Curated annotation (Swiss-Prot):
GO molecular function, one term: structural constituent of ribosome
UniProt cross-references to Pfam families, sorted A to Z: Ribosomal_L36
Signal peptide: none
Domain of life of the native organism: Bacteria
Protein name (record): Large ribosomal subunit protein bL36B
Keyword field contains Repeat: no
Alphabetic keyword roster: Ribonucleoprotein, Ribosomal protein
SUPFAM superfamilies: Ribosomal protein L36
Family membership noted in the UniProt record: Belongs to the bacterial ribosomal protein bL36 family.
InterPro entries: Ribosomal_bL36, Ribosomal_bL36_sp, Ribosomal_L36_bact
GO cellular component: ribonucleoprotein complex; ribosome
NCBIfam families, sorted: PRK00831.1, rpmJ_bact
Organism, scientific name: Leifsonia xyli subsp. xyli (strain CTCB07)
One Gene Ontology term from the biological process aspect of the record: translation
Length: 40
């Protein structure tokens, strides 16, 4: 999981879900976990 300034490219990957937890925006990808990230 990487911290990214912009998660737009991560959320466009197949299998990506955008989730808000504790005020932070995460991208979770079960199909391809390489494309997981946190907006920060």
């Amino acid at each position: 999981m990487k911290v990214r300034a912009s998660i737009k490219s991560l959320k466009n990957q197949p299998g990506a879900q955008v989730v808000r937890r504790r005020g932070r925006v995460y991208v979770i990808n079960k199909l391809n976990p390489r494309f997981e990230g946190l907006q920060g």
